[in-house]
Amino acid sequence: MASTNTNVNAAAEERHHESAAAMERARRFIPGGVNSPVRAFGSVGGTSPFITSASGSQLQDADGLSYVDLVCSWGPMIHGHAHPEIVEAVKSTASRGLSFGAPTSLEVDLAEEIVNRTSVEKVRLVNSGTEATMSAVRLARGFTGRDKILKFEGCYHGHVDSLLVAAGSGVATFGLPDSPGITKAAASDTVVVPYRDIEAVKKAFAENEGQIAAIITEATPGNMGTVSSITADGTSFNAQLKEIAHANGALLIVDEVMTGFRVGYQGWFGKDGVAGDLTTFGKVVSGGLPAAAFGGRADIMDHLAPVGPVYQAGTLSGNPVAMASGLASLKLADEDAYRTLDANAERLIGLITEALNRESVEHHIQRAGTMFSVRFADGEGTNFGEMKAADTFRYPAFFHELLDNGIFAPPSVFETWFVSTALTDADFERFEAALVPAAKAAAAAEA
């Protein structure tokens, strides 16, 4: 099917004819042809490449084209693709069985690694970031005996009913305020305020006195574009939230699904030192397989069944193959790896800035550690409203020129760019060359 998006030219469509055919087949059996909406290229147009293999920093598609990967499976692949040590750990574990329905030492090893690197005292392993945040919210409600959750506009915590209200990520990409199917009752238990607006947080607690179980926040947002939770003067928004939550008998849930073990050895906790009462993890902790975790203070975690009254379970939770992948990924994620990630992010940002400046394109690089996004407006965006108010119309043209020149960037202006340690000098040279037409396209784009 030919695209009607003006950012996708006919020559590019022809180069992707095998991927286009694969997408047509996918649409016969899968809604929209994808199993997660952001993969559908809804905000940029065109058809996503169908990936057949990946190695190091490179993706290969059904048309035989290769791409420098700056999506990294939306975060997990900090070491690049098919890292031999991770692949060997998966193969070795799989050869001894795929799932047992009984405890294994691997899940204890991964839990111990998480505890040793972060503020949490006990961990429960689950299968996805959504499951982690859903379970953390249930536990917070069970522990406090309260029903309401305070979240921030533009922050995304998975597709949990109550947390999809005014969410970011794919919800922002498709311009949805929430989602049909979410009941009024679920929405009524969610209090939403603008991000980094501490007075709005105080007001919300005053208006819902004794009802809010927890504040949930991304450690630093990456689903409305990248927004730092540490202000220009060094103030930690998370520290302010924790103080207010505790003063009102509520908990602080820090969502580190995206930031955990990506922005540093200790995740975002290593950046601001703010320990959530509960913390969620995903992406990097899985090594690329379906796994996630949540943890926190021992007295709270011990409210979980079988030792406490709050029920949470999963047939494949703690799956040995996923545990082996996650553990191998974390073992490789030492301080040298994070220095490389930081240097790679810095180098990419420098190239983007240089290219856009050359074409006089107004922009600001939104950065939080090794995560960043491009905001097509002057100055820092600090909340969802400011991020949406930028010249977002410039991004599709920018994106497609990058894609046509072998760079796989996030297919939405509201998503974070991710780097890996596998990037090479040749990759940076390819990126620099691709930025020349991409910056020109961004400059020429019209609303």
Curated annotation (Swiss-Prot):
Name the source's superkingdom: Bacteria
Required cofactor names: pyridoxal 5'-phosphate
Q: Keywords in alphabetical order, please.
A: Cytoplasm, Isomerase, Porphyrin biosynthesis, Pyridoxal phosphate
A GO BP entry: protoporphyrinogen IX biosynthetic process
Listed SUPFAM superfamilies: PLP-dependent transferases
Pfam families linked to this entry: Aminotran_3
Which Gene Ontology MF annotations are present?
glutamate-1-semialdehyde 2,1-aminomutase activity; pyridoxal phosphate binding; transaminase activity
**Reactions performed catalytically:** (S)-4-amino-5-oxopentanoate = 5-aminolevulinate
Q: Which InterPro entries match?
A: 4pyrrol_synth_GluAld_NH2Trfase, Aminotrans_3, Aminotrans_3_PPA_site, PyrdxlP-dep_Trfase, PyrdxlP-dep_Trfase_major, PyrdxlP-dep_Trfase_small
Respond yes or no to whether keyword Isomerase is given for this record. yes
Q: Which family does it belong to?
A: Belongs to the class-III pyridoxal-phosphate-dependent aminotransferase family. HemL subfamily.
Could you tell me what this protein is called?
A: Glutamate-1-semialdehyde 2,1-aminomutase
- Gene encoding it? hemL
